[in-house]
Amino acid sequence: MDLPGPIHDFLLVFLGSGLLVGGLGVVLLPNPIFSAFSLGFVLVCISLLYILSNSHFVAAAQLLIYVGAINVLIIFAVMFMNDSEYSTDSNLWTVGNGITSLVCTTILFSLMSTILDTSWYGVIWTTRLNQILEQDLISNSQQIGIHLSTDFFLPFELISIILLVALIGAISVARQ
């Protein structure tokens, strides 16, 4: 959106704080229904951030796919669970939680060190090639495909990892 600087900055801070509050709600709320609604709020904030950065097609896809389908599916799955399955236990920290947090922390630091140690020299040539290709492409959807497979490759990979972890978590909760 073409907004004046202060309004754009205010909306950016507002949506960022909404993302933080919603993410904390997903993790910290004891009721899974409220966590699922908080996840929907986070996904809507991400969609609004896409609109703020003039990516209207990606924002619409975000709303349709993630909020409209996946979050509704999560809410239905949680609603079919029994109340006793997500009751609070007296044992808050187990050995499995410690191992899981150790593995996740190790993966996080290895990803951070890999990203920091990688030479990003070839990325400049890729963006220049994309600028040349964009002039030749007729369709807007082809331009979106080029951007999603080059400029936004890392965020899409991170989203796929997050969805995989959510799927594994949902399976483990359903099996208990």
From Swiss-Prot:
It catalyses: a plastoquinone + NADH + (n+1) H(+)(in) = a plastoquinol + NAD(+) + n H(+)(out); a plastoquinone + NADPH + (n+1) H(+)(in) = a plastoquinol + NADP(+) + n H(+)(out). It comes from the Eukaryota. One of its GO terms (molecular function) is NADH dehydrogenase (ubiquinone) activity. It is found in: Plastid, Chloroplast thylakoid membrane. It is a multi-pass membrane protein. The chain crosses the membrane at residues 10-30, 32-52, 61-81, 92-112, 152-172. GO terms for cellular component: chloroplast thylakoid membrane. Belongs to the complex I subunit 6 family. This is NAD(P)H-quinone oxidoreductase subunit 6, chloroplastic. It comes from Nasturtium officinale (Watercress). The lineage of its organism: Eukaryota, Viridiplantae, Streptophyta, Embryophyta, Tracheophyta.
